[in-house]
């Protein structure tokens, strides 16, 4: 109770009460029985409901708790008047199906809002969070870049991507271009890198490299993109300086540079790029110089222009 009173004294408008209900936490953490948990919850909740604050009660390690014990606790605190109950997959053991079934059953038993908190130890945090929403949860815990204990929790960017892919209207109220700035700010403050394959904000998120992909994306980006980078204030990038590049991507680059090269010449240049990339790392500048060299050989001297500040950004 001392911690609860201290929290209220700070002037907060909501208090989150958490206690473990699994046999692991009951035996090796706080040592309380289910009956004692309910008694303690009643003491705390009765006090909080008189303080004009929002009350959230969450079990910890919900997925490894005995279902009968779990629902007994939830139904008890719901009757006590909590505003929200929380389901916590504390060790990331749950699967989307398990989360869906648990939250659906809980939804049928309590009137309070339902919040889901999922850890990512087994890589299911995003899928589990969305399954919880589908089953009737009203709130989902996320963190920027998924930062949290061990492997972290549901990442904000990944969850935004999941909802956007289902229906962009689900995230229409958010200013999506801020996501990149938010990820960058947090990464800088905690001294970590944004993973190259991070949802939305990783540098590879909208990068296309293989020739077959590049050709299709040039024709219609939806062939290999479920998210529209422009909706997040970003651009797609066709990476052409590699051995997997295709002639369609090289053609697009030549057109960007204003070069007049036939398809046969473009195909020949593409094969040369592939061969060079097998033995050395190429830069976009080197590819451009190769294109200009061929242009000069075919059509005479031409004035070169540099657009490497905007390398193959495609808004198509």
Name each model-derived stretch.
Residues 8-15, 23, 41, 45-52, ...:
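Structural signal for hydrophobic packing residues in well-ordered secondary-structure cores
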Residues 31, 35-38, 42, 67, ...:
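Electropositive phosphate-/nucleotide-binding environments in soluble metabolic enzymes
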Residues 20, 61, 90, 120, ...:
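Residue-level "edge-of-site" marker
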Residues 94, 98-225:
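Catalytic alpha/beta core domains of metabolic enzymes, predominantly
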Residues 168-316:
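A mid-to-C-terminal "edge-of-domain" accessory segment
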Residues 1, 22, 62, 92, ...:
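Short, glycine-/Ser/Thr-/acidic-enriched flexible segments
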